[in-house]
Structure formats: C-alpha cells, structure tokens
Amino acid sequence: VFNIESRVHGSRGIPGDWRNTKEHGGGMVLDWGVHLIDQILMMLSERKLISLYATLSFVTNEAVDDGFKILLNYDDGLTCHIEVGTSNFINLPRWYIQGENGTAIIEDWNLNGKIVMVSDWEKRDAVPVVTAAGLTKTMAPRTSETIKEYPLPSVHSDIKDYYRNVFKAIEGKEEIFVKHNEVMRSMRLMEAVMCSAHENRVVFFKDSQLRWE
C-alpha cells in the first residue's frame, strides 16, 4: 500500500450550534478531524510520520473552518490524504486505497465497494483508447483477463466496547484501551494542521510522539 485516502463529505455546511463558534471548539478539524486523524494514526501506528501539509476551507463560515484537507507523508513513502467537506453535493468515496498490485474502494458508511487486483502482469500490451488528443495506451483500461474483483471483507465491531472498557477500567478490572500518549499524538497533529494551514507551510515532526517546530 502506498496511498490511503479518507474522506467524509456533506452538503449542509456547519450546523447552527457549538460547531460554528470558535470559542466553543467549533470547526471541522475539531469536530470530524479528530476522529479521522485518530483512525489513521491507529492504523499506521508502526510507521514513522515525517511531515504534514494542510489547508482549511471557509466557504460557509468565516469564524471556523467548514472543511479541511491534510496530506501526511511517512518515511517509507506512504502518503495519506484526510479530507472533510461540508459543501460537497457529490460525495467522493469514504475510502480509497492504492497498492502495488491493486486498489480498494469503500463508497459509503454501508461498506459498498470492492477490491480490484492484478491477476496477470504478463499481458502488458494494452489496446489504445481514443481521446480528444488522439490515441493513448497510458490510460487504456485493463482487460478483464488481467484483473480480478473481490468483495470487501466484513469486520465485526461494537462501538459499545469502548464504553464497557471505560467502566471496567474505573472499576480496576481492565486496563484502559485509549492511552494518554495516543490522545496526545492526535492533539499534536491537530495543532500541526492549524499551524500548517494558517502559515501555509509544511510541518516536520521530530519524533514518534509528533512533536514539531
């Protein structure tokens, strides 16, 4: 896997409550961003994050961000794109993942999607397609005999497990799932997002705890 894209899109702007007030923690970075960022950090916890670049949008609200785009770069060449938009009347896929031998797509919250993988690397001679600029082989689609489609795997989960763990941790029966250092990493990354967007610069991380300058 060399690229992961995680998106959540809507078309209603920011709701008229605390989400559109800066002093109450409003804006999409703090509302949705914290969840998508934490998700990526947990998925890629064994990889080293080296830099970040982010932009914020203010289409429907000047006080707080109503959307954002974050590009994460890892030391092994992996890139991650995290995006939230509230002025999207046509949604892009919830997940889009590229690997050397295939691509996976998850369209929505209902896990509609598929995995397409190369089944034959030997048949390389593509049939040219006609474009406005003429013939091209570069963007010619693969033929059915060189790729294979797979369904998305189903993974069972229960959001209540988190709350059960908090209850048992308070009782001293279990160790807490979410550690303080994991929370701190997410908070530091969100601060780096704000810095990158406001100063229009790449933020470089100094260590695995995502300290930055």
What function would you assign to each model-found segment?
Residues 41, 71, 163-167, 184, ...:
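Non-transmembrane alpha-helical segments in soluble domains
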